Amino acid sequence: MTLPVWVAAAARAATEALLGRPFSAFQLLELPDRDEPFAVSVTSAAVLAGGEQALSISHCDPGPGLDLTRGLEIWVCVQWQELVVGVDDELNVHSEAWLNLVAGKGVGTLGSGGEACVSRFARELLSRNLYPLVPSGRGLRLEVVLPRGRDLAARTSNAAFGVVDGLALIGTQADVQVSASPDQLQQTIEQLRRQSAASDFCGAMTLVIGENGLDLARQLGLAVQPLLKIGNWLGPVIVAAAEAGVEQLLLLGYHGKLVKLAGGIFHTHHHLADGRLEVLAAMAVREGLPLDLIRQLGQADSMEAALKMLEAQDPELVRKLWYRLAATVEHRSAAYLARYGSWSIAIGAALFDRQRRLRWAGPQGSQQLAVLGVTPEDSPISLSLP
């Protein structure tokens, strides 16, 4: 189950405690994407502050896949509050007028001090399962705390999408979509085939890594051609695109993910393969960076730290390095594809940074973006790959 499901279970248990009901270790949740209620376990629930508040704890279990939220402790604290003035409760049965969702420690917000980053699915899940418990004429203040949220968020690309201070409560369904699983790969390939078989398909497609990358692609106006969100099986999806007759394929992703392709790593799940800093250091050698600087790159804590270090010393050098990297992604992707057959397909790469800025594209990527009326912030340069 995705993180929002475990938050909703704890929220329901806390609300029942606030109502004076006995604790139940399993909460029956109404899930938007299921016909029958689903039992979700919670660890504990108790009233606080003389019965004015209630706290419940649950632990996230995302299923058999590899997921950093496994075992994540979730605290939900609830208390009654007044309804928002001027809102007709009868007309807002499933609105959020009665629900005040507060981002506690470890929950990601949209910018420092901003509102909690919560998906529509997560909000609907809370609304469905809490509204029936809230007495008429009352509102509910609900604070979510993820004690390890900020530490875990440092291992994600949340900051690339403006999410700071913790984990976002995102998800579009109850079940975890395991991006490293063969089943997820098959679903992605089937969707690709449907898109390429459409009567209005013009031969061009954009592969986007992750849900947030998909949102960025739409903001950039790339939805004029098919967009396909993919997980970690980049290599097989590239081959499937060629087999389906795609002629112009654009890979759009966060630089910390696509850098792996420049190293020939085409299954990118972090539990299976990393090597990002090593690839960056190799690119730096080819670009002729000083040896001391290359050593510092290899010792950096993260890709973002390496990028900041380089930009502080020589912004122009950074521009050349990252365009070499984008061009190498294109080159290695074409080489990967050539192992499996011969197709007439141009593969472009476009990379964005943690500030959600489209920064770099390789030669093919720059051409494909230009057709769509999009230009990376850093202008392209000519490169000659070895």
Curated annotation (Swiss-Prot):
GO BP field: anaerobic cobalamin biosynthetic process; methylation
Top-level taxonomic group: Bacteria
Catalyzed reaction equations: Co-precorrin-5B + S-adenosyl-L-methionine = Co-precorrin-6A + S-adenosyl-L-homocysteine
Keyword Metal-binding carried by entry: no
E.C. code: 2.1.1.195
GO function term, MF aspect, one: cobalt-precorrin-5B C1-methyltransferase activity
Broad class of enzyme this protein falls into: transferase
Pathway membership, UniProt: Cofactor biosynthesis; adenosylcobalamin biosynthesis; cob(II)yrinate a,c-diamide from sirohydrochlorin (anaerobic route): step 6/10
Keyword terms, alphabetized: Cobalamin biosynthesis, Methyltransferase, S-adenosyl-L-methionine, Transferase
Family affiliation: Belongs to the CbiD family.
PANTHER family xrefs: COBALT-PRECORRIN-5B C(1)-METHYLTRANSFERASE
Protein name, UniProt field: Cobalt-precorrin-5B C(1)-methyltransferase
Organism: Prochlorococcus marinus (strain MIT 9303)
Gene name of this polypeptide: cbiD
